[in-house]
Swiss-Prot record:
Transmembrane segments: none annotated. Residues 123-179 are annotated as: Disordered. GO terms for cellular component: cytosol; nucleus. It is found in: Cytoplasm; Nucleus. Belongs to the TSR2 family. Residues 123-134 have a biased composition (Basic and acidic residues). This is Pre-rRNA-processing protein tsr2.
Length: 179
């Protein structure tokens, strides 16, 4: 794993994603939804921005990457400032991993995978399994999937019995389907 030079960019994208997901500031931002409800999507977008910037810029420096990180945090995550050096340390790690990958040295990416990537993958698999076990889907008469906790089958029967709703002017009211 991590030894095919033709997949250099893919390996680097993976390493950036793992480092960004493991960065305590970003973990807190996602948990507390600093960027509204789509914070995880913005984190993933940020990873793409960092990959694009680092791979396109010749002689990229950690200071420049740190500035980009801070700018994105300010614009997208509403972060005024960060009190520690962690953005610079993250930027340094990203630049070092890219420079090593450009020399076909994938050892830093392997280390990131062993140290952080496996834990993230196991955590995600655990979350998926927990979600599936706690809320199994139930098939109802009209073959729509409804959550068991929802009481969706009883609600579906009520809607069928009610029929269309007509307003005072004689128009049929279109209602949004409840999930």
């Amino acid at each position: 794993m991590f030894d095919d030079p033709s997949k250099r960019l893919t390996y680097f994208e993976y390493a950036v994603g793992v480092l960004l997901c493991s960065w305590p500031v970003m973990k807190q931002a996602v948990e507390e939804e600093w960027a509204d409800v789509d914070t995880a999507d913005k984190r993933d977008w940020m990873a793409g921005v960092l990959v694009d910037y680092i791979t396109v810029t010749s002689d990229v420096e950690a200071w420049d990457v740190e500035e980009l990180i801070l700018q994105v945090l300010q614009d997208e995550f509403n972060v005024g400032s960060i009190e520690d050096d962690s953005p610079y340390i993250l930027a340094q790690d990203l630049v070092n991993v890219w420079k090593a990958a450009c020399e076909d040295n994938y050892e830093p990416i392997r280390e990131i995978h062993e140290r952080l990537g496996k834990q993230l993958l196991e955590k995600e698999e655990g979350k998926e399994k927990t979600r599936e076990e706690s809320n199994p889907p139930v098939l109802v008469e009209d073959e729509t999937i409804v959550d068991a906790e929802d009481g969706g089958a009883a609600q579906n029967q009520q809607e069928k019995q009610q029929g269309p709703i007509v307003d005072d002017d004689g128009f049929t009211v279109v209602q949004k389907r409840r999930r």
